[in-house]
């Protein structure tokens, strides 16, 4: 049974996480994968999300996968209570997850009933295909994909993050307009999160956030 917390910007909806996790997140071990942000010029969100996890009492372990052995990665994910995949370039993230076999490790983690947290690219990556995110992220960051954008296929919808948020508002709106007729699009702003708990799928909004 899938248990997913899929945000546009985790730190803005972190207040909703304890209830979703059964008010049992303090002391939990979180594997934090920041790989999507490696080629980005702006990365403040990585530190903000990590700080939000720690503020909730979780123990955060950085797992930057590009230079780690498969054995190290597999061991860390196997021992983790939660896996967190941060934002950045979704195409680069898919390329590196696929190259290291971490896509399958994450799927196994989810299939074992363990909780997954995504933020922006980390949420979008769970779709069947991420080609729809082409206006938001540069394809040039992931030449090894060779046009194959098949992703983790954990959910049957496609998340468009940052719907009302600068500087992505117009790009997000363009993406929704172009693909909503052919894909199951779920667009969220930074103050919203899509939660999946088995068959239940719901969009929640954090109070006091925009």
What are these regions (language model features)?
Residues 8-9, 192-193, 197-210:
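Patatin-like phospholipase A catalytic core
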Residues 30, 83, 120, 159, ...:
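A residue-level signal for conserved active-site and pocket-lining positions in enzyme catalytic cores
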Residues 153-197:
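Conserved anion/nucleotide-ligand pocket segment
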Residues 1-82, 86:
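N-terminal beta1-alpha1 cap of cysteine-dependent amidohydrolase-like domains
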Residues 36-38, 88-91, 121-122, 164:
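Short glycine-rich anion-binding loops that position phosphate/pyrophosphate groups of nucleotides
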Residues 91, 123-126, 193-195:
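Short, active-site-adjacent cap segments at secondary-structure transitions
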Residues 57, 80, 113, 155-156, ...:
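Short, well-ordered alpha-helix to beta-strand connector turns
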């Amino acid at each position: 049974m899938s248990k997913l917390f899929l945000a546009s910007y985790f730190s803005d909806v972190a207040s909703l996480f304890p209830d979703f996790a059964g008010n049992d997140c303090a002391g939990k071990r979180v594997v934090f994968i920041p790989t999507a942000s490696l080629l980005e010029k702006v990365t403040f969100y990585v530190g903000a999300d990590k700080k939000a996890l720690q503020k909730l009492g979780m123990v955060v372990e950085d797992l930057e996968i590009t230079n780690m052995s498969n054995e190290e990665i597999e061991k860390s994910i196997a021992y983790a209570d939660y896996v967190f995949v941060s934002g950045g370039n979704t195409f680069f993230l898919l390329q590196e997850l696929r190259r290291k076999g971490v896509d399958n490790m994450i799927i196994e983690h989810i299939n074992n009933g363990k909780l997954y947290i995504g933020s922006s690219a980390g949420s979008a990556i769970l779709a069947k295909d991420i080609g729809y995110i082409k206006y938001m992220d540069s394809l040039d960051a992931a030449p090894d994909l060779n046009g194959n954008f098949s992703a983790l296929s954990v959910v049957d919808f496609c998340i468009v993050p940052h719907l009302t948020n600068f500087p992505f508002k117009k790009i997000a709106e363009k993406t929704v307009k172009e693909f909503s007729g052919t894909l199951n699009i779920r667009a969220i702003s930074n103050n919203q999160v899509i939660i999946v708990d088995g068959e239940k799928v719901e969009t929640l909004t954090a109070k006091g956030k925009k």
